[in-house]
Amino acid sequence: MSSISNVYHDYSSFSNATTFSQVYQNFNQLDNLNVFEKLWGSYYYYMANDLFATGLLFFLTHEIFYFGRCLPWAIIDRIPYFRKWKIQDEKIPSDKEQWECLKSVLTSHFLVEAFPIWFFHPLCQKIGISYQVPFPKITDMLIQWAVFFVLEDTWHYWFHRGLHYGVFYKYIHKQHHRYAAPFGLAAEYAHPVEVALLGLGTVGIPIVWCLITGNLHLFTVSIWIILRLFQAVDAHSGYEFPWSLHNFLPFWAGADHHDEHHHYFIGGYSSSFRWWDFILDTEAGPKAKKGREDKVKQNVEKLQKKNL
């Protein structure tokens, strides 16, 4: 029996269950749990093997939500009506490009990313990441997701910027820049070393958080990974809509920020936010270049006036 049953002191009212539906009916008797907690508890109880349950959960979560988020963008690429919002409207990914990208991403998922997933549950037990029910308070999870976004963005900025130097770009990061006009599926089209390095920011930051605070739930990590997947896919979508998030949150990076990075190959190294590129003057594109040139010109003029 799965150790999730240890959360409760009395299972005398539970009937013998052989199907997931029957297990859920048992958990449905517990009034102190919401529907998501009941589903979560039922899943672990039914699987009866926490290591396998966590590994399968994370693998399926990654596959379902990554490709599920890519699919709408692939459909939009085939509908001419949306071209007016396509940032590089003359560069629509062909079926061949989509297929080649899909094969590479699937290979990476099964041969690079799938293997370490099965070690995550023992790590959870080792450092104290909870997977029991009930879940933490929503306010706690919101704070943690916000912190993870900020810290991951910092990790991504510096390591992504580092991958644009010399041999790191030539032998590792160049693969990701095969598509000068990105599309959703290309979000995880990358060299295995890059997948591991940048992925470490997504997974490693929650681990460090738990080591420091001792307060983290596996459900929080699961939702964080989904949010990060959505952010990455949307940033590579190649579309800028009037309702895009950065039009309401100016510091959010969004597709236009990352599209310019792919178009011009340098600058725009952040993942979720714009502040690192703004502070360190590494924004991409002609507008940013002109801004830097104007700034240099102004500084020269000030210096000349000072020396008169």
UniProtKB/Swiss-Prot annotation:
Transmembrane found in the keyword field: yes
Enzyme class per UniProt: oxidoreductase
Histidine box-2 (motif): residue ranges: 173-177
Family: Belongs to the sterol desaturase family.
First and last residue of the signal peptide: none
EC number: 1.14.18.9
GO annotation terms (biological process): ergosterol biosynthetic process
Keyword NAD: yes
Consequences of knocking out this gene: Essential gene; conditional lethal mutations decrease the production of ergosterol and accumulate 4,4-dimethylzymosterol.
Function of the protein: Catalyzes the three-step monooxygenation required for the demethylation of 4,4-dimethyl and 4alpha-methylsterols. The third module or late pathway involves the ergosterol synthesis itself through consecutive reactions that mainly occur in the endoplasmic reticulum (ER) membrane.
Motif (Histidine box-1): 160-164
Main localisation: endoplasmic reticulum
Keyword annotations of the record: Endoplasmic reticulum, Iron, Lipid biosynthesis, Lipid metabolism, Membrane, NAD, Oxidoreductase, Steroid biosynthesis, Steroid metabolism, Sterol biosynthesis, Sterol metabolism, Transmembrane, Transmembrane helix
Involved pathway(s): Steroid biosynthesis; zymosterol biosynthesis; zymosterol from lanosterol: step 3/6
Bilayer-crossing regions: 56-76
GO MF entry, a single one: C-4 methylsterol oxidase activity
Domain free text: The histidine box domains may contain the active site and/or be involved in metal ion binding.
Organism: Candida albicans (strain SC5314 / ATCC MYA-2876) (Yeast)
Localisation per UniProt entry: Endoplasmic reticulum membrane
Lineage of source species: Eukaryota, Fungi, Dikarya, Ascomycota, Saccharomycotina
Protein name: C-4 methylsterol oxidase
Domain Fatty acid hydroxylase intervals: 145-282
